[in-house]
From Swiss-Prot:
InterPro entries: Endthln_rcpt, ETA_rcpt, GPCR_endothelin_rcpt, GPCR_Rhodpsn, GPCR_Rhodpsn_7TM. The lineage of its organism: Eukaryota, Metazoa, Chordata, Craniata, Vertebrata. Receptor for endothelin-1. Mediates its action by association with G proteins that activate a phosphatidylinositol-calcium second messenger system. The rank order of binding affinities for ET-A is: ET1 > ET2 >> ET3. The gene is EDNRA. GO terms for biological process: adenylate cyclase-inhibiting G protein-coupled receptor signaling pathway; aorta development; artery smooth muscle contraction; atrial cardiac muscle tissue development; axon extension; axonogenesis involved in innervation; blood vessel remodeling; branching involved in blood vessel morphogenesis. Glycans are attached at N29, N62. This is Endothelin-1 receptor. Interacts with HDAC7 and KAT5. Residues 21-80, 133-159, 230-256, 329-347 are extracellular. Disulfide bonds join C158-C239. The modification Phosphoserine is found at S425.
Length: 427
């Protein structure tokens, strides 16, 4: 029975690696040096498993055959199609959800403010990843090879794929940090009522976020190359991280810790710090006539702060399993341990689950906003189900100030638009 579960978790994790096959997958990130492609002894794989020397998935650094893990692996077509359905679902939900979120913010002038601009920036980063990277994942899973592997366009995709993946994560992380800082600024200046429009400082922040995210993803574009190999008598090429310089060797060696520290811990620490400061600010100013006069205004800002906090929590839940499996692999796994196969199967299964959860993060933010905030829920319903509203009176929305959208007739909206410019919208 133990052998059965060992085999099951092992091939499940291998499919997970093929699904993502990005900078986060074990097929390109388990070891220090990437210079070979191997297949597992006694297996019947419909795809190529890329491994590394001296530390590949099952073969120790001495390369002896008797040190292979004993499990046999076989991938069923049904399992591949199940994962294809999951990827397609994420693609559809992510594309529709993030595109709708961008449309809502773009079409409503009253929503063009600092916090909404950061949320739109986050959604755009997720949308780019969903539209470009996920189709490549599905193709690799079904075809069992890298797309356009024999021509220059395949090389371009090999550079673009990990670059966009890492850029998307960087955009998400830095936007969450910026939103936490923005919420603290909003509470610290609670007597100031923010108007409509994107502040210059927020525009600079967004541009800086994208530039920095692209810069930090450059090592991925440099390190990933098309590596030729022979499999079952046929010549193939696959996209792998191949460290050919001292800098890339250093990057590959510290990559797991760098990803864990910057792309996971930093937004959590930033949120913890600024939300603690925000709480202290609210407690220190809990009394006062001005606060009483602006109690509704402060309530609106607290609701927005809760929404941002929810996005950070979802990010942590989606990415924690993947980072945990990488850190455990780095610190606990010993390739020379005779009992390593049981631990390896557990880590691979955790990695597979983590990869899918991390991918889900690119489509789950619009869903979270739909359920957490009534204002977003009403906006999504209005935008996605506009045909259902055509028989009703022409309706438009006022700024998203409270926990729900207040709908006004077209004539009333003209009167309220000018007043709304002095309120703090969602935000």
């Amino acid at each position: 029975m133990e052998t059965f579960w060992l085999r099951l978790s092992f091939w499940v994790a291998l499919v997970g690696g093929v699904i993502s096959d990005n900078p986060e997958s074990y097929s390109t990130n388990l070891s220090i040096h990437v210079d070979s492609v191997a297949t597992f002894h006694g297996t019947e794989l419909s795809f190529v498993v890329t491994t590394h020397q001296p530390t590949n998935l099952a073969l120790p650094s001495n390369g002896s055959m008797h040190n292979y893990c004993p499990q046999q692996t076989k991938i069923t077509s049904a399992f591949k199609y199940i994962n294809t359905v999951i990827s397609c679902t994420i693609f559809i939900v992510g594309m529709v959800g993030n595109a709708t979120l961008l449309r809502i913010i773009y079409q409503n002038k009253c929503m063009r403010n600092g916090p909404n601009a950061l949320i739109a920036s986050l959604a755009l980063g997720d949308l780019i990843y969903v539209v470009i990277d996920l189709p490549i994942n599905v193709f690799k899973l079904l075809a069992g090879r890298w797309p356009f592997e024999q021509n220059d366009f395949g090389v371009f995709l090999c550079k673009l794929f990990p670059f966009l993946q890492k850029s998307s994560v960087g955009i998400t992380v830095l936007n969450l940090c910026a939103l936490s800082v923005d919420r603290y600024r909003a509470v610290a200046s609670w007597s100031r009522v923010q108007g409509i429009g994107i502040p210059l400082v927020t525009a600079i922040e967004i541009v800086s976020i994208w530039i920095l995210s692209f810069i930090l993803a450059i090592p991925e574009a440099i390190g990933f190359v098309m590596v030729p190999f022979e499999y079952k008598g046929a010549q193939h090429r696959t996209c792998m991280l191949n460290a050919t310089s001292k800098f890339m060797e250093f990057y590959q060696d510290v990559k797991d810790w760098w990803l864990f520290g910057f792309y996971f811990c930093m937004p959590l620490v930033c949120t913890a710090i600024f939300y603690t400061l925000m709480t202290c600010e609210m407690l220190n100013r809990r009394n006062g006539s001005l606060r009483i006069a602006l109690s509704e205004h402060l309530k609106q800002r607290r609701e927005v702060a809760k929404t941002v906090f929810c996005l950070v929590v979802i990010f942590a839940l989606c990415w924690f399993p993947l980072h945990l499996s990488r850190i455990l692999k780095k610190t606990v796994y010993d390739e020379m341990d005779t009992n390593r196969c049981e631990l390896l199967s557990f880590l691979l299964l955790m990695d597979y689950i983590g990869i899918n959860l991390a991918t889900m993060n690119s489509c789950i933010n619009p869903i979270a906003l739909y359920f957490v905030s009534k204002k977003f829920k009403n906006c999504f319903q209005s935008c996605l189900c506009c045909c259902c509203y055509q028989s009703k009176s022409l309706m438009t929305s006022v700024p998203m100030n409270g926990t729900s959208i207040q709908w006004k007739n077209h004539e009333q909206n003209n009167h309220n638009t000018e007043r709304s410019s002095h309120k703090d919208s969602i935000n």
